[in-house]
């Protein structure tokens, strides 16, 4: 399983905008960006990156999703869960890159797309299986200069 300790170059962590934090039973994703949109994007990429090595994922096609929630936390949960469902069901899609197309913070709606390919066991190794995002200790910390997101995922 990937871990922060495996990556010695802190500049690489800053470039990709996410890291994995140890948790007693699961794993905590920590992502950030200069905007909430960037932090959401990085969080989703980190989720896929925890499941497989994204360096081996090619941007073969695009996948589109929509999600909605009843709060920002609910929206983040649905955002991650919607994409995770595409991994667990056909076409077993893995996103290497994500872009938010529409982000409505008042209606808690989001439209986004990812570039990647279908998971192929002959090409991709399974690092870990994420079953679901959780609300446990979920945090969205938005400041004028940066947004940080913390999400514990069930593995």
Curated annotation (Swiss-Prot):
Family: Belongs to the archease family.
Pfam families: Archease
Signal peptide: none
GO terms of molecular function: metal ion binding
A GO term from the CC aspect: tRNA-splicing ligase complex
PANTHER family documented for this protein: ARCHEASE, PROTEIN ARCHEASE
GO BP terms in the entry: tRNA splicing, via endonucleolytic cleavage and ligation
Keywords from the UniProt entry: Calcium, Metal-binding, tRNA processing
SUPFAM superfamilies attached to this UniProt entry: MTH1598-like
Protein name: Protein archease-like
Binding site for Ca(2+): 26, 154-155
InterPro entries membership: Archease, Archease_dom, Archease_dom_sf
Function, as annotated: Component of the tRNA-splicing ligase complex required to facilitate the enzymatic turnover of catalytic subunit RtcB (F16A11.2).
């Amino acid at each position: 399983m990937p871990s922060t300790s495996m990556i010695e170059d802190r500049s690489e962590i800053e470039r990709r905008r996410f890291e994995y934090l140890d948790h007693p039973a699961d794993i905590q994703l920590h992502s950030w960006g200069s905007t909430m949109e960037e932090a959401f994007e990085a969080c989703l990429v980190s989720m896929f990156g925890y499941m497989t090595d994204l360096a081996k994922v090619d941007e073969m096609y695009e996948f589109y999703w929509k999600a909605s929630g009843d709060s920002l936390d609910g929206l983040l949960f649905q955002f991650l869960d919607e994409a995770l469902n595409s991994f667990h069901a056909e076409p077993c899609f893995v996103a290497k890159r994500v872009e938010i197309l529409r982000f409505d913070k008042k209606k808690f709606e989001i439209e986004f797309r990812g570039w990647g390919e279908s998971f192929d066991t002959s090409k991709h190794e399974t690092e870990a299986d994420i079953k679901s995002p959780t609300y446990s200790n979920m945090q969205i910390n938005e400041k004028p200069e940066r947004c940080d997101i913390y999400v514990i995922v069930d593995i």
